[in-house]
Design a protein with these regions (language model features):
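Bacterial Sec-dependent N-terminal signal peptides
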Residues: 1-26
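Metal-dependent active-site segment of extracytoplasmic phospho-/sulfohydrolases and closely related
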Residues: 30, 48, 211-252
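Loop/turn elements at helix/coil->beta-strand transitions in domains of secreted/extracellular proteins
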Residues: 24-29, 54-58, 126-132, 178-184, ...
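Active-site neighborhoods of enzymes that stabilize oxyanions during catalysis
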Residues: 265-376
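Structural recognition of the beta-strand scaffold that forms the well-ordered cores
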Residues: 28-32, 39, 59-62, 75-77, ...
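Active-site-proximal alpha/beta segments of enzymes that process anionic O-linked groups
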Residues: 25, 40-57, 61-178, 370, ...
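A long, amphipathic alpha-helix that forms part
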Residues: 162-174, 191-232, 374
Length: 397
């Protein structure tokens, strides 16, 4: 009986130890590198990304359609397809408000009316967690009356440099425990800019990919020197990749369309065409069969793209072949994205390392699953979304 009693007490004690270990606080850091192709790490010298692959999860993300910056960054933090969260393109027209959402217009860009869903910083904040966000698209918008605990306005000058943002993340992690955020997110606009200007295989793009890699090497060293280093889950990802566009690879459509049919045309990968009442068939028939593109009515977009149920999507969509732009102006050579996620050129980076991640090479997965993953890491209840942690549970310890 004495032995049984001791065994029972030992079991209870072990259970307590196990609970206290599993309840040990883990922090989550998510960094987005705009326009970082999943295979840049194969083309260029990226020792930091290689180290992450050797220690943790090596994968890639399949972007949501269209493979553009704002729709995908907002998908990453809500788990919703652009069609469901409302940021259906970088630039779009809203029939209900009669206004255009544009990245170049700070007032429209920060208008909460456009942002649906429950961004991760709101999900976390409601469940008593602290958040700090450095320039993630949508983080300076008052979605559902709330901001992250710490955030920065992207259009306010002087803008924090990429290095200052990385420094800021380290500063947040070094705060006393009571003030330290549970979730820290950061956004870097490179290598996207260079990818556009010089193409994915341009010398300057390679130089920027390698510059970002060395910045991250330094960032990681500083992170590893913190007392909480072993309690940090670090995710490095991107919103989309980058495809090569050759000079002259443009599909002009304007000359085929009558003014009296049109309200507005927004974007060039894809082009969203907003038409006057009763003119959808005229526009569709005028464009159907053009070279280097597919033309769809809004309600006939292939189901796999999860696009077209939102009223902000054009009445007619012109979706170009990889490497082509829908525009009258001659295309310059360089890089572009927005294309169908079936093309691996627009697939994005995913790396993760930390106490909750296995060392594993995992197939590319849909980026709607990232919100669910972050909720899981933070131990919080997720809001309704289009992803599912079960799709990627294999990457977790």
């Amino acid at each position: 009986q004495e032995i049984m009693k001791k065994l029972f007490l030992t079991t209870i004690l072990l259970a307590f130890v196990a609970i206290s270990i599993s309840a040990k606080k883990h922090y989550t850091v998510v960094l987005s590198l705009d326009g970082y192709r999943w295979d840049y790490t194969q083309w260029y010298n990226t020792p930091f990304m290689d180290m992450m692959a050797e220690k943790g999860v090596e994968s890639g993300l399949i972007p949501s359609y269209p493979s553009k910056t704002f729709p995908n960054h907002y998908t990453l933090v809500t788990g919703l397809y652009p069609d469901h969260h409302g940021i259906v393109a970088n630039n779009f027209y809203d029939v209900r408000t009669g206004a255009s959402f544009s990245l170049g217009n700070a007032e429209q860009k920060t208008n909460p009316v456009y942002y649906g869903g429950d961004p991760i910083w709101n999900t976390a904040k409601r469940q008593e967690l602290k958040t700090a966000v450095f320039y993630w698209p949508g983080s300076d918008v008052c979605v559902c009356g709330s901001y992250p605990d710490t955030y920065y306005i992207y259009d306010k000058q002087p803008r924090l440099t990429m290095q200052q943002r990385l420094d800021g993340i380290i500063e947040q992690l070094a705060l006393p425990e009571k003030k330290r955020p549970d979730l820290i997110m950061g956004y870097l606009e490179e290598p996207d800019h260079n990818g556009h200007d010089f193409g994915p295989q341009g010398k300057q793009t390679r130089a920027m990919v390698q510059k970002v890699d060395s910045m991250l090497t330094n960032f990681y060293k500083r992170m590893q020197a913190l007392p909480i280093a072993n309690d940090i889950n670090l995710i490095i990802l991107s919103d989309h990749g980058m495809a090569w566009v050759a000079k002259g690879n443009n599909v002009p459509i304007r000359h085929l369309l009558k003014d009296e049919w049109l309200v507005k045309i927004e974007g060039n990968i894809p082009a969203n065409i907003y038409v006057k009442p009763g003119c959808q068939d005229s526009v569709y028939n005028a464009l159907h069969g053009i070279e280097h593109a597919r033309v769809w009515k809004r309600n006939n977009i292939p189901a796999r793209l999860h696009y077209g149920t939102n009223g902000r999507v054009g009445d007619v969509i012109v979706d170009p072949d990889l490497g082509w732009l829908i525009q009258n102006k001659e295309a310059n050579e360089g890089g572009a994205h927005g294309f169908d996620p079936e093309y691996s050129d627009v697939h994005a980076l995913f790396r993760a390392v930390g106490p909750d991640f296995k060392h594993i090479k995992f197939p590319h997965f849909a980026n709607v699953n990232v919100y669910s993953l972050i909720c899981h890491l933070l131990g919080i209840k997720e809001s309704k979304n289009d992803g599912n942690i079960d799709n990627i549970r294999t990457i977790l310890q």
